[in-house]
Amino acid sequence: MGINVLFIYPNTFGMNMLPPAIATFSAILKQHNHQVQVFDTTYYAVDYGIDSDGSKEQGLNVIPFSKEMEKKNLRIKNTNWKTDLKKQLEEFKPDLLALSATEDMWELGIHILEEIKEYKQKNNIPVLAGGVFPTFAPEICSKHDLIDMVCVGEGENALIDLCKKIENKEDHLDVTNLWVKKDGKIVKKNTISNPVDINKNPIIDVSLFEENRLYRPMAGKIYKMFPVETIRGCPFTCKFCNSPDQM
């Protein structure tokens, strides 16, 4: 039967690359009979951050593409993200909320969780934080009272194990890659699992996202595209970058 998993992707307009991790997790979870949805803020007017691609256009860093976006009808939604999210929660009734974020997305992610704090607490829904920022700053991410677990590293195996334990109403303190909190304090920092063989991952589930998320500006035109993951980490060892730590 499985459980309902709602991914929260606190993205800002202009950062249009579809997140391959969430699309991969969706495909894997569906293979294990779980139901998956995503709340993606990319096309909402959230009054947060900047329009990345738009600012590049204004700064003459890229060929203007605004008219091309209008032709594709790629515009900010005219609905309120708070209303839409609460409606999705009531209809989907998630058993797990999974926040995926980079450092620049983290504050918006927390803002979203604050907005649904009452619903989360009333229905006792656990929140898992994962992604680049939680992986490299689990101490910071785990401090927030609305975060129940932090995934450090790859999430494929951790998500499968966690969802199975939630479905069976079992304790999830021993799920690898997870830092788990109880009563507001970290009670378990589990070990990191062996690297995932990405060649065994299924094709990403792009159906999880609205079609407009497949469009992205390039050279002044708007193209339909999606990312393909061929490797994780980076073979280079630049002093200013944290990627070598992943290898």
Question: Which ranges hold each PLM region?
Answer:
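Radical SAM [4Fe-4S] cluster-binding motif and immediate context
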Residues: 199-247
